[in-house]
From Swiss-Prot:
Protein name: Large ribosomal subunit protein uL18
Record-linked HAMAP family: Ribosomal_uL18_B
Gene: rplR
Subunit structure, interactors included: Part of the 50S ribosomal subunit; part of the 5S rRNA/L5/L18/L25 subcomplex. Contacts the 5S and 23S rRNAs.
Keywords for the protein's UniProt record, in alphabetical order: Ribonucleoprotein, Ribosomal protein, RNA-binding, rRNA-binding
GO function term, MF aspect, one: structural constituent of ribosome
GO-annotated biological processes: translation
Organism field: Nitratiruptor sp. (strain SB155-2)
Function: This is one of the proteins that bind and probably mediate the attachment of the 5S RNA into the large ribosomal subunit, where it forms part of the central protuberance.
GO cellular component: cytosolic large ribosomal subunit
Family: Belongs to the universal ribosomal protein uL18 family.
Pfam families reported in the protein's UniProt record: Ribosomal_L18p
Length: 118
């Protein structure tokens, strides 16, 4: 039986995710910012991989935003504010296997506009 297109896309995304995830790690002073997007919501979290703890997160569902380029900037502003409160200015960006365009690129640009370096 043939694999559906949606399952194939997700399988390939997970394959990219695992390949990249083996190469990048975050620390307490330079955490890894990982994103997840669904059709309805966008999530981002800053992770300290040495301890396995989430330092800060931003949830698009709680902010009441949709997944589009303009609304994702609000999620980035929220996360940047939380990171600055923790005195974190540099991060490692983990796009989680998603292609760097559209809402992912918009999120990354908004983080840079809010003073987060990567």
């Amino acid at each position: 039986m043939r694999e559906s297109i949606q399952r194939r896309k997700n399988r390939l995304r997970i394959k990219r995710k695992r390949r990249v995830r083996g190469k990048i790690t975050g620390s307490a002073d330079r955490p890894r910012v990982s994103i997840f997007k669904s059709n309805r919501h966008f999530y981002a979290q800053a992770i300290d991989d040495t301890k396995g703890h989430t330092l800060a997160y931003s949830d698009g569902a709680k902010l009441g935003v949709k997944v589009n380029k303009e609304d994702v900037k609000k999620v980035a502003e929220d996360l940047a504010g939380k990171l600055k409160a923790l005195n974190i200015e540099t991060i490692v960006f983990d796009r989680n296997g998603y292609l760097y365009h559209g809402v992912v690129a918009s999120f990354a640009d908004a983080l840079r506009e809010n003073g987060i370096k990567f």
